Amino acid sequence: MGASLPPKEANLFKLIVKSYETKQYKKGLKAADAILKKFPDHGETLSMKGLTLNCMDRKTEAYELVRLGVKNDIKSHVCWHVLGLLYRSDREYREAIKCYRNALRIDPDNLEILRDLSLLQAQMRDLSGFVETRQQLLTLKPNHRMNWIGFAVSQHLNANASKAVEILEAYEGTLEDDYPPENELIEHTEMILYKVSLLEESGSFDKALEELHKKEPKIVDKLSYKEQEVSLLSKVGRLEEANKLYRVLLSMNPDNYRYHEGLQKCLGLYSESGQYSSDQIEKLNALYQSLSEQYTRSSAVKRIPLDFLQDENFKEAVAKYIKPLLTKGVPSLFSDLSSLYDHPRKPDILEQLVVEMKHSIGTTGSFPGSDVKEPPSTLLWTLFFLAQHYDRRGQYDVALCKIDEAIAHTPTVIDLYSVKSRIMKHAGDLTAAAALADEARGMDLADRYINSECVKRMLQADQVPLAEKTAVLFTKEGDQLNNLHDMQCMWYDLASGDSYFRQGDLGRALKKFLAVEKHYADISEDQFDFHSYCLRKMTLRSYVDMLKFQDRLHSFPYFHKAAIRAIRCYLKLHDSPKSTAGEDEMSKLAPAQKKKIKKQKKAEARAKKEAESKSEESTASGASKSGKRNVKPVDPDPHGQKLIQVEEPMAEASKYLRLLQKHSPNSLETHLLSFEVNMRKQKFLLAFQAVKQLLKLGAENPDSHRSLVKFFLMTESISAPTTEAEKLRWRVLEAERPSISQLQNKSLMEANKEFLGRHEDSLVHRAAYAEMLYILDPSKKTEAIKIIEDSTNKVVQTNEALGQAREWKLKDCIAVHTLLDTVLLDSQAASRWKSRCAEYFPCSTHFEGKHCSLMPDSVYNSSRKSNENGDTPNHPMGQTELSDGQLEAFKSLSVAT
């Protein structure tokens, strides 16, 4: 570096490099300017000056200088390396790799460039290139441990675990007999356990077990040793030994559910589906009775039997489990037992049991069959549990009654107001839910979780400004909304995006949904620093697990939800474009002219973007000269207006659709959106492929049925094909149609009728039938409406201890109301449906039920009026919280407790 310079300037060049490494950017710039004064065309100095400016957020100048440096000294590996570093800093990894490869053509044995290249190859999952680079590093420096380990890991990632084992064995052959020293015991342990895991992954279980036992004296992590050993013993079929070892592990941690699962598998008693034979139940019961005698304080040992016990045995066990927790006052008890509600009989048993407990405590002060007096709080937590139970079963009136009783008993418990808020949300009164959540928040202004719950309720009630003010109470001073974004608060972005979408503000909605995508990009970027760190620290198993996690990152729920919502925004933009005079003129032009104008617009947009970028940098350059990174620039599009001005919404939607198809292929929504997008793009074969996937994943799903009917109705309505491509497409569709069982020897009308016959008792299926009937034959609109109105809201079979639960869900009823109003276009039918549903959901603001907060004479508003008139307040905080913690917007809202 700097070899072509005289000694004085060469020393200055070394100073530039040192200043860059120590982040003394002003000092580095001064040295670079001193060299360039005498040698203005020195490529390496220009490149280093550009690299320094890049660290000071003067990116445009940086790229200009570095590219000039490469131009002036194209045969310098330093210039190419620096250009690669610039691209890497901007996440342009493919361009950076090209630059590194150019640098290596000039200096093929440069260790620093090879290391940087290997990091990028690992990041981009260029696994064959990663193997090649790590092998080259090992060849150049075989006495460096990290090069051996890096080569082994590269082979492992490239699906060659056996080769990775060979490399680790070769490395072990270079070590002394007394290795490792005291200060490297942990690193060596990690390497041994990693090697054993590789043998396990390659299927060499016996060899892995032998290696583990052989190296036991050198392994200091005894817990990992035991966990690895028991896993291998199970896989080689030595179940008796595995059984004993799992019991040893349980003695160390009896609340580890993985150990319980492993023990059950060893005994042949584990069930993936949760269904057990009577013999399995008997053996499991005996096992956990013996374990409960050993581990009297273990909650897992008490909780696990509730999953497999039935009837009276279940009732006895669950009573024994919940009594001490109700006495203690554990708010999370219902969450703990919520999985039991997936079993057919257990919720009824729970209800009967807890109702008996509540009655007994209320009358005698003790649990049934006990003489021990319970503290007053036991009744409170019993009511608290019952409220959540009835909420889960859809009996919102009973749930509200129970939670009000609990509040009357002890009006100072915050959890009661949070649960009442949740019940009101489920019952359909989102405004009241937000007010209650704010009331709970006001009782403890330092509780971040309660604050977040309140924000969520406000967003669900479309009170976005209030939600923002509340959310930023727990962010840093300064630019609080940006701080909220930096915290990667994805639930907030999704909830606020949903609110904007409901309000028709597609710009802001898209802004929020794409912010979630940005969070995922940042998470993916965060792995970069670990490629070298984990090899250096020898945390190899965690490193490989992290890479596997990153590979499936986009399959996680938040990204899935954000991508689906973003696609729906683009669909709405496509269906309702904002036409302008310019667009009207465009529609009159010939295709060639349109193409030319579009090309010009793209070039203008690109030039404008570059100009804006330069303007931002020049504005920020004053602060940059200090040598420190700038504060974040102001968002040029805070309301997302540029996002909704996209020329081709379907092209943008397709980007996110491809990610969903790759990472969420088993989601019905993925293929439903694929159908919607491809129908709009007139890519009929892809749309048909989506229909087939929908039928494969859920043939009886109403949306699958809708898509099937819409697709073949469209194919029947299109004129005869003229081009060869169109003819081929129709031949494919004609050949494939008989493979659809729903349409074999049937017309679409007949298939629709059969669909209704299979689901006569389901509201959502009747609605799907009615919609398709109207689309197939608009003259049958009256019949379609009658099919919906003849639906019956049946009572769900329960023990009917308190009230009755009905089948219809609020969201389904709202969807049917929207269908009647906007698709079938019958306002009178929609009004009749609204009145009918108001009876079933009296708290729903959508249906304006008699108990919802919109009604002036509702129970809620009457209650608030009585408080204001001086009657006994039914809320502990009265007017105090209105001035101390509760938001002003809720002062006028009446919510009874």
Swiss-Prot record:
Annotated stretches, region: Disordered: 578-640, 863-897
Annotated SUPFAM superfamilies: TPR-like
Entry's induction text: Down-regulated upon abscisic acid treatment.
UniProt xrefs under Pfam families: NatA_aux_su (PF12569), TPR_1 (PF00515)
Tissue: Expressed in leaves, roots, shoots and flowers.
Cellular component GO terms held in the UniProt record: cytoplasm
Polar residues bias: start-end ranges: 863-872
Phenotype upon loss of function: Embryo lethal when homozygous.
Annotated Basic and acidic residues bias: 602-617
This protein's UniProt keywords: Repeat, TPR repeat
Ranges occupied by TPR repeats: 77-110, 111-144, 189-222, 223-256, 298-331, 380-413, 488-523
Subunit-level organization: Part of the NatA complex. Associates with ribosomes. Interacts with NAA10.
PANTHER family in the cross-refs: N(ALPHA)-ACETYLTRANSFERASE 15_16, ISOFORM A, N-TERMINAL ACETYLTRANSFERASE-RELATED
Role, per record: Auxiliary subunit of the NatA N-alpha-acetyltransferase complex. Required for male gametocyte development, embryogenesis, suspensor development and the formation of the quiescent center (QC) in the root meristem. Involved in plant immunity through the regulation of SNC1 stability. Required for embryo development.
Protein name, UniProt field: N-terminal acetyltransferase A complex auxiliary subunit NAA15
Organism: Arabidopsis thaliana (Mouse-ear cress)
Lineage: Eukaryota, Viridiplantae, Streptophyta, Embryophyta, Tracheophyta
